[in-house]
Amino acid sequence: GVVGQQAYMPWWLAGQQHKLDFPGGYKALLVSGRKMPSLNTGKSFDRVSGGDGIPFGKKLKEDARRYHGSFQSIGAQGAMAANDDCYCELDPGVKDKWGIPVLRFHWKWSDDELRQVSHQQQAMTEILEAMGARFFHAPYVDKPEKAISQGGKIIHEVGGVIMGDNPEKSVTNQWGQTWDVPNLILGDGATF
């Protein structure tokens, strides 16, 4: 699908998943387009113009004419399987202004996600090379931890609240209504 100056390329290897060394898949996100110059416009010119630092004066004008609007980026957003290192709990020492314990989150990428990112980096590199692209930096095929974002930074995380038909084993019923708080309905993605 296309959204503004973005295009999404759905997971294309679903039928070959058994041959890969990670579960799940990912989608590619292609971003480009022209827009009005801003204060950040010149920050990328030094990477492509071969200069030392951000250009000024005549060189900046030349680079702006040559490179502005000609950048393309490709990213990927992938599936993450639940693992024992990712959970939240009530913090025993920190309370909010009403005296209620706050949530403390624990997060760790598994080897599966890191292998997925290596695959993403290789696939996106091949796509960009086929387009004749020049790279600002070498892809992180062998260093996926440099390419992967912090958990929750890019995608909208869901889950954490169990939906079910037993109040002893779930937080909500099948309609997202909580068992313990009358008339409280969870309308976000927490139950998924």
Residue ranges and their predicted role:
Residues 161-179:
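FAD-site-proximal beta/loop scaffold in flavoenzymes
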Residues 47-54, 104, 110-156:
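Mobile, glycine/GP-rich and aromatic-enriched active-site lid/loop segments adjacent to catalytic centers
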Residues 1-103, 108-111, 154-157, 179, ...:
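FAD cofactor-binding and catalytic pocket of flavoenzymes
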Residues 83-84, 97, 144-148, 170:
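Flexible loop/turn segments at secondary-structure boundaries
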Residues 82, 150-155, 164, 171:
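Short, functionally important structural connectors and interaction interfaces within domains
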Residues 90, 124, 163, 176, ...:
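Hydrophobic, well-ordered secondary-structure elements that form the walls
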